[in-house]
Amino acid sequence: MSKRSARLADKTRADRRREPSTTLDRSRNKTTTPWLAVIFLIALLIRLFHLVQIEAIPLFYHLAGDGRTYDEWAQRIAAGDWLGTGVFYQTPLYPYFLGVLQLIFGHNLWLIRFLQILLGSLSCALIYLIGAQLFSRAAGIAAGLVLAFYAPAIFFDALIEKSILDLTLLCLMLCLLLDFGRAPYVVKWIGVGSLLGLLGLSRENALILVPLVALWIFVGFSRESLASRPRRLGCFLAGLIFVLVPVGLRNLVIGGEFKLTTAQLGPNFFIGNNPAADGTYGSVRHLIKEVQLEGSDAKRLAERAIGRQLTPGEVSSYWLSQAIDYIKAQPADWLRLLGRKWLLVWNAREIEDSDDYYIYRQFSAPLTILGWFAHFGTLACLAAVGIYLAWRDWRRLWLVYAMILALAASVAIFYVFGRYRYPLVPLLALFAGVGIVEAGRLFREKAWRPLFKAAIIWVSTAVIVHWPMGGDAAPGAAGYNNLANAYSKQGKVDAAIKAAQRAVEIQPDYGVAHYNLGNLYMQQGRVEMARRHFGEALRLLPNYAEAQSNYGQLLAEGGDLAAGMEHFKKAIALNASVGRAHLNLGVALARTGRMDEAIAPLRQAALLSPEAAEPIYYLGSIYAAQNHYAEAEAAFVQALRLRPDFAPAHQSLAQLLALQGKKEQAAQHHQEALRLMR
């Protein structure tokens, strides 16, 4: 062999090390920067228009459910609490993402949402690249535009919620899998493992992709030596370990247990697999007779059942065992439930979580217009046609098919929300792009037979995805209830009542909405209406401690202190962590003259709600009544430190200071009280 030939052979071997050949076909058409920019800008303009419009919805700044939890968590991170407490219950990536943004930009929810829609628009451009690499430039363009105009994607991208990271990380991982940059295999596979690990810290069920990618490493590189495949697998696993093990160590050090992600497997599995389950989250309320089975609630109920304190891992194991017991006892019922959940995953309706897609459609012109046709039902039909028309290439596409099936199964095994299936969307968009382009080609070529088969597949898929099992494609009771809470925080009580009433009209047995109506009517002084809805809430959710406490408050304020105290005590027995129940009990005891007995529940209320001024104020009032002036003054001062605009505390402190002859200070607090009460 000549020296020149030897150099060429060495170069070829080196290139192969840097550029592993895969069974996924390389693009037949070069992707171009202009199309990247066009798709990105189209997606961005649509999402920006949507963002401007939804600022009018009360939920934009008054977050609900997980969004509020993530935001509060992020604020603690931005304030310096980087490690937190206990084993993670919810996946941590998005709260830390938010926390870093809030550390840099402050608590600016509009700007954060804008940055998120930039990521969403980038993901549309990435889908174009992936589609061009897998199929053709035309298919890539179609796939990118499908995602750009897909109404639920526009909705999810602008929420304070982790779906945006699910989308972006999955698209980036697919790009690395396809090796656009011809990266050295060490960098590539460590990157793939790291991105999948990050995706698992946002959407835990995505870790089901780990064995699929590992399998593909071994069977998808047919032209590479067997010896090189373990090295690739090792790099992939190293990337996973690099991301997940530090989280596990953090959980071990802070929470006492080594968990690679979170400790919510058991409760989540039970929510989706129990005798009352119907495939959605809300069904578990019928079983536990409470509002939710989350974090502290899951722990409290498990500890009550076991009779001792439990670690997060033990709590998860308890609920997992409860679900498995149900499956063993009623296997036929569980299989029917599993089939129902599988169909719900593919149903056209976006099953609502804290934020209801269909309520946002009422505020957003892009969602209103695009929602008529650019929804999951259309996407699934287009993707089914694309899968059929691309089936001849199944050997090089099997990983993508397997990812779709695995992600869908990982949702169905638990329970279904629209956002839980969102990671399916970019994968389906790829095949939707193929379906559009190939169907157009067949039409131009007048290839009627394959077009007829494609039409049959479209119709069959449409029947399945539009089967009436997920409810109407309209706002749900939970969405209206959360809207009512947001209106209430804005001080718009009438609008809040109207929204909560709509929730009850949609779902008369929705106890949470009855509870909120009770609170709203009590706020307006409409006692009989409040009594009626509190009663209905407690009939539906007798173990709801907050409802017991607030109904007791209504009774106590109406003069029936004895009945009120019974409800306060029941609330505490159900959930001793409800500070309001302790506060209400302490106030009621004080009103009956049982001052000494009132101190303990008021102190407990202050301990449970350290940011609340009311428990400290009432303690000060009791100390003052007992002539313990020093303790009373300290309590009133502390209450005002917590809440400077608390007029009753200013007035009580003024009276106390006057009794002690401190007339100048008393006058200042008296004047401040008058100013605040005007």
Language-model segments: residues:
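Membrane-proximal lumenal/periplasmic loop motifs of glycosylation machinery
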Residues: I54-R68, R76-R113, Y326
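Membrane-interface transmembrane helices that cradle and orient dolichyl/undecaprenyl
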Residues: S27, A138, M173-W189, I217-E224
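Membrane-proximal stem/loop segments at transmembrane-domain junctions that anchor or position
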Residues: L260-L344
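Membrane-interface anchor segments at the N-terminal boundary of transmembrane helices
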Residues: T33, Y326, D333-V400
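Transmembrane-helix motifs of polytopic, lipid-linked glycan transferases
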Residues: F114-F135, L172, L176, C381-V385
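Short helix- or helix-capping micro-motifs
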Residues: A43-I46, A143-A151, C175, L196, ...
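Conserved alpha-helical positions within TPR/SEL1-like repeat arrays
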Residues: A478-S488, V512-M522, E546-A556, R580-A590, ...
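Transmembrane-helix signature of polytopic, membrane-embedded enzymes
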Residues: K3, F40, L122-F149, L167-T168, ...
